[in-house]
């Protein structure tokens, strides 16, 4: 199989040096003055068809003489009947889409307002990125209360940080609690409130606040037993019982004898019994985050050996404050002063959050489809993360964090890799236990959904030979599927608007099926601007969960969709004017063909690329159907010769006018590509494009010959031809010159038919197509597909085994495609690599369940509608 998987397609295609563009002289068809990509371009209107055909002795258009209107003896009988359903998207619907000229004045005013708002939001978000320091987050009443406990180091008996005590007095909520007002979780509110009560009681301040706080705790404490375990803050069972004991000693009137409280005390005792003191004092563990709950077992001098470089204990102000009160450690005080210099009169539940903030902000703008506005900011953020990337251990939420976690490490590995940074998946070995299972950090007792989701997403960008990525994919897939099946896709690290929806999308549409526009549409609906995370208390990431991202994403999606609708109208108009509506043998799918590129190369700057891609796709489908189901073998050979000579007169002897419609559509469109390609690239590309089309038709002819002879090739022989006939290379190479990048030959050869990259695109596309079409093709008499060829070559093999073999080839090739996309050494522009990679991905989407192109009135109809026609609210 190595020959199939790795051999490059032989090709002698070379671009001509810069020469004046010449029109073919075989027939006189002048170029139109407008670009072939303009919305008013008309390459093949009916009157022109008649005129041109008259020039070569043909007196009727395809619209005037259909094959079923020919005399009986001249009527052609199709070799095969594919029997596809008619067009899903009718012309009247496409024509009804808002015209760019309707209500021009009011529409212009609205567009101007929207564009101004978009520009404002972009500037505001750019400022957010540029102002990222150690992390923007909300106050933690719990941690602020612990810092407020610290007595003055001058021995005056006053608080060392009086502003924090004043913050507590000023920030009690109306219900008597302390905590994040935007969300109510009983565990979180009671914990925050109890911490503030203890501090006020210690300083004998705020009697009224204490009374209201006690009433709140008494009223809500028992609610904790009914709250989901995943809403319990980190370290709760360690710190809360210890604080209750302290509250009791201070005389706070609380329901200490509730059965639920006794259960929490028992959990604490069991946990403490499991903690070897030598581990606590000699190893970096998550216990450092909650030392205030372990005061009765900690050796305070020994524990300072585990202090982080910034003076904190696992970035926790509460834990650090507790250590300081026991040790007077100056580095602890330095850390607390540092945090308060940032926030003034309060502290967050952990700080810094610099790596977490940057990675999640980048991920957010990418998933929402607005990352193109922030290329500079993304580069700066990822350079920052890479500066602190630990290839051996991974990373945590902050640069100084001594305990890496799989959540931040997996997110960083995936994003850095896709942006061309050299990062190894070996780092994931740090997050496995003796059984091979993955954990978030050492000593973890629960498996979270978000950390598994990020590890799952990371595993999708696997390179060849990365066993650990495959194992991570298997592990996380099982965990996430189980969570969905049990209706338990909720997390102990985050409270999100629609985490189950995120998980469901990720499982249904993994990386190689998840197209950018579909992901953006889905994430716009799932994104919560008030999402919160759970540490020791609820906390917000203000530069991650931010309403500005969502507003920009919605405005931008609808703006881009409006552009796509205009381009859809152009493609459908071109289809009609070329006479393709009247072809009786082909699938009427111009909208789906446009969708296949708009769903990935969606940005406005790729308009010309999209138009070329969609037109080429349409032509390839027409010619595929022509060679598959309509033309006689003799006529098809004449058609191929006409294309080789670029001369319609070769078809003079052919009575079937539909072949001439096909030729003129191809001829005019590709000549238009040549004209515009000369402008884009500064040299003639028409000869190059013609060679590409010749190669495609040669593959179609071979398949027609096989069909006529009922010949079944070997598996390798089939694949070598079929990866050409799938036409993905043709589609890519007819649109690649319109990405806005100059492509000299030394670059072009890295992505054209001479490259492994395009070979893999074609291979995966052909094979996934076969897995969903071979049965229908077999039922209508076609003998050749990868599945059938493999079974014929291996007669002992079952159909399921043959399919498994084909899927195995696809899986390996997709991993190689990941490498071709992300290869740091590649000279090919990223947008060009994206074009190839997304062509492979859209095939995985189209053929996910069935032949989504032939049968486009089911899942694909919804995808097309959500991408092109339904605006986001």
From Swiss-Prot:
GO terms for biological process: diterpenoid biosynthetic process. Mg(2+) 3 binds at residues 769, 773, 777. Gene3D superfamilies: 1.50.10.160, Farnesyl Diphosphate Synthase, Terpene synthase, N-terminal domain. One of its GO terms (molecular function) is terpene synthase activity. Expressed in roots. Binds 3 Mg(2+) ions per subunit. GO terms for cellular component: chloroplast. It is found in: Plastid, Chloroplast. Its EC number is 4.2.3.32, 5.5.1.12. Mg(2+) 1 binds at residues 624, 628. Pfam families: Terpene_synth, Terpene_synth_C. Its main location: plastid. The keyword Chaperone does not apply. Pathway: Terpene metabolism; ginkgolide biosynthesis. CDD domains: Terpene_cyclase_plant_C1. Substrate binds at residues 271, 492. Belongs to the terpene synthase family. Tpsd subfamily. The Asp-Xaa-Asp-Asp (DXDD) motif is important for the catalytic activity in the class II active site relevant for the cyclization of GGPP. The Asp-Asp-Xaa-Xaa-Asp/Glu (DDXXD/E) motif is important for the catalytic activity in the class I active site, presumably through binding to Mg(2+). This is Bifunctional levopimaradiene synthase, chloroplastic. It comes from Ginkgo biloba. The lineage of its organism: Eukaryota, Viridiplantae, Streptophyta, Embryophyta, Tracheophyta.
């Amino acid at each position: 199989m190595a020959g199939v998987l790795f051999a490059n397609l032989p090709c002698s295609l070379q671009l001509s040096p810069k020469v004046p563009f010449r029109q073919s002289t075989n027939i006189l068809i002048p170029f139109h003055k407008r670009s072939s990509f303009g919305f008013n371009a008309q390459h093949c209107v009916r009157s022109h068809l008649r005129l041109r055909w008259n020039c070569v002795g043909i007196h009727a258009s395809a619209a005037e003489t259909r094959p079923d209107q020919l005399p009986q003896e001249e009527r052609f009988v199709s070799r095969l009947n594919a029997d596809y359903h008619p067009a899903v998207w009718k012309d009247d619907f496409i024509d009804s889409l808002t015209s760019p000229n309707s209500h021009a004045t009011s529409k212009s005013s609205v567009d101007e307002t929207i564009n101004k708002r978009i520009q404002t939001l972009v500037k505001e978000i750019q400022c957010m990125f540029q102002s990222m320091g150690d992390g923007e987050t909300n106050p933690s009443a719990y941690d602020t209360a612990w810092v407020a406990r610290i007595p003055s180091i001058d021995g005056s008996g006053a608080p060392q940080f009086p502003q924090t005590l004043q913050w507590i007095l000023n920030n009690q909520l109306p219900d008597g609690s302390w905590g994040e007002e935007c969300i109510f979780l009983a565990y979180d509110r009671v914990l925050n409130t109890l911490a503030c009560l203890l501090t006020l009681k210690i300083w004998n301040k705020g009697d009224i606040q204490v009374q209201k706080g006690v009433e709140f705790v008494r009223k809500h404490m028992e609610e904790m037993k009914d709250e989901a375990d995943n809403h319990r803050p980190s370290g709760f069972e360690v710190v809360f019982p210890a604080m209750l004991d302290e509250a009791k000693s201070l005389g706070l009137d609380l329901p200490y004898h509730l059965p639920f409280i006794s259960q929490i005390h028992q959990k604490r005792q069991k946990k403490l019994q499991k903690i070897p003191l030598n581990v606590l004092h000699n190893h970096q563990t998550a216990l450092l985050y909650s030392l205030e709950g372990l005061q009765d077992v900690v050796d305070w001098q020994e524990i300072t050996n585990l202090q982080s470089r910034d003076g904190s204990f696992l970035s926790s102000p509460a834990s650090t404050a507790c250590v300081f009160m026991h040790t007077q450690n100056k580095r602890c005080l330095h850390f607390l002063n540092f945090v308060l210099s940032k926030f003034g009169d309060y502290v967050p539940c952990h700080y810094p959050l610099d790596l977490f903030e940057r990675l999640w902000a980048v991920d957010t703008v990418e998933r929402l489809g607005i990352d193109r506005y922030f290329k500079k900011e993304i580069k700066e953020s990822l350079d920052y993360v890479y500066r602190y990337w630990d290839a051996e251990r991974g990373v945590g939420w902050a640069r100084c964090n001594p305990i890496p976690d799989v959540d931040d490490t997996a997110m960083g590995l995936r994003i850095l890799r896709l942006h061309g940074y050299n990062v190894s998946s070996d780092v994931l070995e740090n997050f496995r236990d003796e059984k091979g299972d993955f954990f978030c950090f050492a000593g973890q007792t629960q498996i979270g959904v978000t950390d598994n989701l990020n590890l799952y997403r990371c595993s999708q960008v696997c390179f060849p030979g990365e066993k650990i990525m495959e194992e991570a994919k298997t592990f996380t897939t099982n965990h996430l599927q189980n969570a969905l099946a049990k209706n338990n896709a909720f997390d102990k690290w985050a409270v999100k608007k629609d985490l189950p929806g995120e998980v469901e999308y990720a499982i249904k549409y993994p990386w190689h099926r998840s197209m950018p526009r579909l992901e953006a549409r889905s994430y716009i609906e799932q994104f919560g601007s008030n999402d919160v995370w759970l540490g020791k208390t609820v906390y917000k990431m203000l530069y991650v969960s931010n309403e500005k991202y969502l507003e920009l994403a919605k405005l931008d999606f609808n703006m881009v969709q409006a552009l796509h609708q205009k381009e859809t109208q152009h493609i459908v108009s071109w289809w009609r004017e070329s006479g393709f509506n009247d072809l009786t043998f082909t699938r009427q799918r111009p909208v789906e063909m446009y969708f296949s590129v708009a769903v990935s190369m969606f940005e406005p700057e790729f308009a010309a690329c999209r138009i070329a891609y969609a037109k080429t796709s349409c032509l390839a489908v027409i010619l595929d159907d022509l060679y598959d189901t309509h033309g006689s073998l003799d006529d098809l050979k004449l058609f191929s010769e006409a294309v080789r000579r670029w001369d319609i007169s070769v078809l003079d002897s052919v009575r079937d006018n539909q072949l001439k419609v096909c030729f003129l559509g191809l001829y005019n469109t590709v000549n238009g590509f040549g004209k515009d390609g000369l402008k884009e690239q500064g040299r003639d590309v028409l000869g190059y494009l013609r060679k590409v089309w010749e190669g495609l038709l040669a593959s179609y002819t071979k398949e027609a010959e096989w069909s006529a002879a009922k010949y079944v090739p070997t598996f390798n022989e089939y694949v070598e031809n079929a990866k050409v006939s799938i036409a993905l290379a043709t589609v890519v190479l007819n649109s690649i010159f319109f990405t806005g990048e100059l492509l000299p030959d030394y670059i072009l050869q890295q992505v054209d038919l001479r490259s492994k990259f395009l070979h893999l695109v074609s291979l995966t596309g052909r094979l996934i197509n076969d897995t969903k079409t071979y049965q229908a093709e077999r039922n209508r008499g076609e003998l050749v597909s990868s599945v059938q060829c493999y079974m014929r070559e291996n007669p002992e093999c079952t159909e399921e085994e043959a399919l498994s073999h084909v899927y195995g080839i696809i899986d390996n090739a997709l991993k190689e495609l990941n490498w071709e996309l992300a290869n740091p050494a590649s000279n090919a522009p990223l947008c060009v690599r994206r074009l190839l990679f997304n062509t492979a991905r859209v095939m995985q989407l189209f053929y996910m369940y069935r032949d989504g192109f032939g049968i486009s009135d089911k899942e694909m109809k919804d995808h097309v509608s959500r991408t092109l026609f339904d605006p986001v609210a």
